[in-house]
Amino acid sequence: ESYSLNHISHVVLGDEKLDYSDVGTFMETYENDHQRFIDYHIKDVELVHRIDEKLGLIDLVMTMAYMAGVNYNDTLGTTAIWDCIIYRELMSKKIAVPQPKDHKKAAFVGGYVKDPHVGMHDWVMSFDLNSLYPNIIIQYNMSPETLIRMPNAIGAKAANGATFRKDKVGIIPELVEKLYVTRVSTKQEMLKVKQQIEDEGKSDSLVRKATILENKQMATKILLNSLYGAMGNRYFRYFDLLVAEGVTTTGQAVIQHAEKAVNGFLNKAMQDDKDRVIAMDTDSLYVGVGDLVDKYCKEDPVQFLDRFAKEAIEPILEKSFEQFAKDTDAYTNRMVMKREAIADRGIWTAKKRYILNVHNNEGVQYAEPKIKVMGIEAVKSSTPEVCRDAMKQMFKIIISGDERKTQDAIAEFKDYFKSLSADKVAFPRGVSDITSYADRNHIFSKGTPIHSRGALLYNYYVKKKQLDKRYRLIQNGDKIKFIYLNKRNEMQQNVISFPDDKLPDELGLNKYIDYDLQFQKTFLDPLDIILKSIKWQAEPVANLEDFFV
């Protein structure tokens, strides 16, 4: 949602940065309360240290670096780290490392994303293909040295027609297999510890153990997933367009094959031809089974669906993937699709945008359902924090299926929103280059983005009112906030930006904040996308019958 230290500290630690607002500005704190200024920086360092103690992020980087044999900085990229991994493997086998080549820039297809069934759905199960792209590489033995560059070649065939040798294992598939085995065993151990935490409650030792295992499996996952990013990069030593495109096109074929298998099985079970796959995203299926629950099990749907997924759908998928591998003459069958989430309700607004009320995830049963949000404004750092928090609460009400309660909650939050200061309700943004938009005669030039326009106005009026010694000016690269104004203000402008701590009172703009427009833009517009998808209104709509009540 936000990468600010204050937000991360609040979420991870339940703590925040030291507040100095009672002293004044940051510069005034330095001049008038130097001890507070020192304490502020000490607290920042303590927060960073505590976050790392809890999340083990430095451990994650070190784990990746040691696994790959690279410097710590190289773990942040994809090509350098895999270049080193493959280099070490080739050296161990006494195989000469090929020289890098120049490759022309070329676009190729990505993952398949289905147009979702927009709206609200009861009882949704998600199924996820285990490490799709890495397993495709293994399944078709995809490696530059195994690619057969002859027409009508015999071998393992990717969906784009690329054919690979089956008489020897490629270097890249061999490396992927080693990493994959490590990740699977680590993840299984991690899930056991997480279930233990759910059953027994949190303890420092269990949380720490779960974090260590999470970091180890995450390091392996990052390495596995970054391989495809490297293989699709024309600057990678082992780049080959046929191989890179073979991975994605085969991924598309596999996920659509899975959709057909699931729909076919459920159609047969329910004796209809309904499309129950609500959405698909590269390696995931979201299946609506509300009618199945209504027909067969209303008392304990979560347990029923857990069993149904294991004993019915997963075997069907396994059988279909075996046939797919046979049809494409694969080197081996590596496709495994397991049930991930069980949710009693889900809402889709568009591709990759949904809300799920999850009861069980990968076999971990939650004491209380957890809301999973993907692609919705509430999880974007460009939305004010107060609106993100309110939207999460709103999702819980919406998921309950009560339109009137949702409308009441919106009205209540709007009243609270209007009582807040500018820094709480303003849009968080970053400005990369405000100087290029400056205009000596008109402050800003035509076509200036709204947040940059607000920044130039702020700088102009802070200097005009001789406040620049008290308040710092906005510079290129700064994190700022901007807010809408009524045009009746001194500037006769509809926006002002300010550094992310406070809008100076001396500018006299607080009384001109357009709270209605700000509420509409920051909260109601994003929420309305969800409400429209389920045909709800944000406010009660009067009709003729209400007149006679």
Task: Label every model-predicted segment.
Residues K168-F236:
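Active-site cores of enzymes that catalyze phosphoryl transfer or operate on phosphate-rich substrates
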Residues K17-M27, P100-A107, K157-A158, L191-K194, ...:
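Active-site-adjacent bridging/hinge elements
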Residues M150-K168, L175-E177:
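Conserved phosphoryl-transfer catalytic core
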Residues E1-V45:
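Active-site-proximal helix-loop-helix substrate-binding element of RNase H-like nuclease domains
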Residues D52, M62-Y140, P144-R149, I154, ...:
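DNA-dependent DNA polymerase catalytic subunits
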Residues R36-I51, K178, T182-S185, T250-H257, ...:
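A non-catalytic, amphipathic alpha-helix used as a structural packing/dimerization or gating element
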Residues D22-E31, A162-T163, M231-F239, Y286-K295:
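A short small-residue
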Residues S9, D44, V48, R183, ...:
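A residue-level signal for conserved active-site and pocket-lining positions in enzyme catalytic cores
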